[in-house]
Amino acid sequence: MLRRVSFAVLLVLAPAGVARAQSLRDQIRTDLFTFGNCGEPLCLAGSLGAHGGHFIPSDTSSSGSMLTLLGTALSQSVSNVPVSATSAGVTYSFVGGLPVKTSTSGGPIFGERAQTLGKGRWFIGANVTAMNFQRLRGIPMNEVTFNFTHADVSPSGPTPNDTLGSPEFENDVVQVKLALNISVLVTTFVASYGLVDGVDLSVAVPVVHTSVQGTSVATIIPFDFPTPHFFAGDATNPVLTAVSGMDGSASGLGDISARLKVNVVQSGDFGVSVLGDARFPTGDENNLLGAGAFSGRGLAIASARFGTITPHLNFGYAFRDAKFANNSILATGGFDNQLSGWATMAFELMSEWELGASKLKIPGVVHYLAPFPHTVTPTNIPDQQDNFLNASMGFKFQTPKGILITTNALFPLRNSGLEPAVVWTSGLEYSF
């Protein structure tokens, strides 16, 4: 058995291919925001002289921030796919050298219960999670809009002018409307082992496939005519609209996690444990396969048993080392109900609450001073904290061979971050 498990892990860890040499983040930046043959995002190939480069993100900090926002939100959402519990099915403790059952139900699906496996026992599982992202902070993925503003250029000469809006062409805006279809398929292999009675060590290895298709429609909104900004044509007959698109995918190893659970208190019907979870940046952030930085969780776990119903509470703290990710408070509550000897229903409310102002910043409103005071809002994406609340409901069915078949649906309840309408999970679990 160990030989087969080792071989499977080696296959998972083998380098996975990427559909294109260019990373998905680069494709989003270049393919969706490059129009014409200029070769740079927001470069206006048809414009006269230096005017073609006045919207390039490297020259306009707010434009660069918006492209960073989109790519970072994508990679963080992919890396936050929930991982199944460290144990499932029947668990044991040893009393007088003999194994005694501490649980008989199938257990929770994503939350943790206090019981551990028991010394020398194994839990292995594999599940597949599928999602299609539908909204970004509540904005539908086919309605995301960016307004890219002109760089504040100072005309040459003896009287330079640093007032934004003067000359008048600085008031021109390039509006880009996106329609994105982003799908993620995660296959996760989990193995847990009872080091001693009351202490479990677990490893979760995800393999991620991310697919991104999108179209973008860019429109130059001139403040006045004639305008020096256009995609094609000339100042007399300017072409002010352009379309671009992308279709890319990537597959590979996600962020591997290692977890250690220690049972502190365990009676017949009540238990308390603590869990430490470390996620390592083994997934390629640029291809939207991982977070690109270390993260860790610490949880306090309490669970009880009332007949066939086993409630559990998890409360803890998440640390994230990524530049644009916040630390957060974690809270999960739920129960599993043994419907029969072979079927268990599980329900959970899972939440995550950011600490401090969100590091994933929306560029601020741009204020113009000329020819009259006015403002431009860079995007319709709200500037807010990303606090998550999800409802999860699923079932576990035990086969005559002792294998658990898991099905689950998770529903986001808040408009935070990049979210799907539903997250589907199915898998197999086995304890021995």
Feature map (PLM): residue ranges:
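A subset of solvent-exposed loop/turn segments in beta-rich extracellular surface proteins, enriched
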Residues: Q22-A204, V208-A250, G254, K361, ...
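Residues on the lipid-exposed face of transmembrane beta-strands in outer-membrane beta-barrel proteins
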Residues: G106, F110-R113, I124-V128, F189-Y193, ...
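Residues that define the transmembrane beta-barrel architecture of outer-membrane proteins
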Residues: G106, G118-G120, I182-T187, S251-I256, ...
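Extracellular loop and loop/strand-boundary signature of outer-membrane beta-barrel proteins
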Residues: F110-G111, V173-K177, A242-D247, G283-L288, ...
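Transmembrane beta-strands of outer-membrane beta-barrel pores
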Residues: V128-Q134, V205-S211, D255, V264, ...
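Repeated loop/turn-to-beta-strand initiation elements of outer-membrane beta-barrel proteins
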Residues: F133, V199-V203, S267-G271, T308-L313, ...
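Outer-membrane beta-barrel translocator domains and adjoining extracellular loop/strand segments
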Residues: L136-M141, G214-I220, V274-D277, D284-G292, ...
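Outer membrane beta-barrel transmembrane domains
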Residues: E143-T149, S154-S156, F225-A242, A325, ...
